């Protein structure tokens, strides 16, 4: 089984290929919002590095968000098109799950925080379990100050990870028992996507391309701006 993982939910574009033998090749780049221009060359690069032909891919996995609306649309649309063309199933994974996954060996409460722009964060809480992580809360949207209050209320050691944690570091760095993970793990990675998708694929927990939808949690900024203008006197 070979899985192609595509992640464009944040400022970073990440692509990976892997399967039973683990991750065979991966790449990530941050080029502003040039997701469409970066994605195809990234797919070509990892396939070449892994010595894999696209026709050998048996599952396409994609980051469903939450994250940047434009990036999500690019990644999900491309993943759907590839799965349809290759006639293979798909697996979708949350960006917050992907951000939390590299910390699966931590005994602390894991808090993933992805920058939602507009002074807000997409967040969820996780705990280490045998073989990975378990989400303890629904995905939700909060302000940095509200998340800070949530962390204070837990009264246990926490590890805070994600580009939202990095952006609003000054809000969290004074909190007792809260460790902020540095920028190296700030973005979801397609390598984590491949590993999580592989576990789901073994359980045949996949979906048809037309059934897979992005996880937005909030209206697009363009729609919010339009509604704001309509509400003005």
How would you describe each model-predicted region?
Residues 48, 52, 152, 199-206, ...:
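Generic secondary-structure signature for well-ordered alpha-helical cores
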Residues 46-50, 85, 103, 190-201:
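Stable alpha-helical structural segments in soluble proteins, enriched in small hydrophobic residues
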Residues 61-90:
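DPxDG-like acidic metal-binding loop motif
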Residues 48-55, 83-95:
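Phosphate-handling active-site elements
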Residues 57, 206-209:
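Flexible, glycine/charged-enriched surface loops at secondary-structure junctions
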């Amino acid at each position: 089984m070979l899985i192609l993982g595509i992640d464009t939910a944040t400022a970073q574009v990440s692509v990976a290929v892997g399967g039973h033998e683990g991750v065979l090749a991966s790449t990530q780049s941050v080029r502003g919002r040039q997701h469409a221009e970066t994605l195809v060359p990234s797919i070509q690069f990892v396939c070449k590095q892994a010595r894999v032909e696209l026709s050998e891919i048996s599952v396409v996995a994609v980051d469903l968000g939450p994250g940047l609306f434009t990036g999500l649309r690019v990644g999900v649309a491309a993943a759907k098109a590839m799965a349809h063309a290759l006639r293979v199933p798909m697996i979708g994974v949350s960006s917050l799950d992907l951000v939390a996954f590299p910390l699966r060996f931590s005994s602390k409460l894991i808090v993933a925080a992805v920058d939602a722009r507009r002074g807000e964060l997409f967040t969820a809480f996780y705990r280490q379990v045998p073989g990975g992580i378990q989400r303890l809360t629904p995905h939700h949207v909060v302000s940095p100050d509200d998340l800070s209050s949530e962390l204070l209320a837990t009264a246990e050691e926490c590890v805070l990870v994600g580009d939202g944690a990095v952006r609003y570091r000054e809000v969290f760095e004074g909190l007792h028992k809260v460790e902020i993970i540095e920028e190296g793990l700030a973005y979801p990675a397609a390598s984590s996507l491949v590993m999580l998708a592989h576990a789901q694929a073994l359980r045949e927990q996949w979906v048809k391309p037309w059934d897979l939808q992005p996880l937005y949690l909030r209206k697009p900024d363009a729609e919010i701006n339009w509604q704001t203008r309509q509400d003005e006197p």
